[in-house]
Amino acid sequence: MGALTPLVLEAVRFGYGSERVLDGLSLRVEAGEGVALLGANGAGKTTLTRLAMALRHPQQGRVVTCGRLTAGKKPEDFADVAGYLFQNPEAQLFARTVRAEVAFGPERMGWHPPRVMEAVDRVLGELGLASDAARHPYDLPGPTRRLVALAAALVGSPRLLILDEPTAGLDRGARVRVAEVVLALRAQGAAVLAVTHDLGFAAEVLDRAVVLEGKRVTRDAPLSDLLGHHPDFPAPPLLDLARRLGLEGVRPAIGTLAPLLTSPPETGTLQA
């Protein structure tokens, strides 16, 4: 994968009716970066991801996804370079089998059948879905449907992967598998932008934190700084920030993949 900047938002303004959601927001996500997009409910996180995928269009400013302006374009115009996991996976599942769902994108892009089969088998295996390949997605439990939608987003090896709450409802093993495939994609040079309330997952898979507050980016720094590893980072203490943003899975330090992701996320006061 090349060094083309996968995502650029410049002075973006967007709202629904009279309600301004983003106001002059600018953000760049470079190749190979893993960015955690954090913020309270209603901060505009999902709106930002929809702008990046041309599901919405800025009212002012511009959005450039993998070198292409999103203005006047549709999501399918970016299917060959970007993958998107909706917060609600049912919004993107339509095929009669898991295999057909995951194969749809590559087939639409004109891949030869052997290449499609190889890519689909690979991603289904990586996410533990191989035994579900012939099942109807809606016969599967909600967390497994999320994995199917993620497989469809990953199968084309996108340059930009956008995830909206990728670990919601997943068990320990599934969280580890998701982490592994995201890290592998980043190692190939892809950028990952993840909306998440699971700070434990973010700490293991992502390395940069962008916080949305007041309709724009208010903090942009290494995730380790946000976690309290840098004395000069002007952020509230970790737990105070976590409670305010509704984060879960908080730990006092970044550990290794297996211990953190195989521990159940902390809930209670840290929930939004």
Give the role of each language-model region.
Residues 114-132:
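Conserved ABC ATPase "signature" region
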Residues 53:
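Helix-to-loop junction immediately C-terminal to a conserved catalytic motif
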Residues 228-272:
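ABC ATPase nucleotide-binding domains
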Residues 38-40:
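The feature captures the beta-strand-to-loop junction immediately N-terminal to the Walker
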Residues 153-154:
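ABC ATPase C-loop
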Residues 196-197:
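H-loop/switch region of ABC-family ATPase nucleotide-binding domains
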Residues 61-69, 78:
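Conserved ABC transporter NBD signature motif
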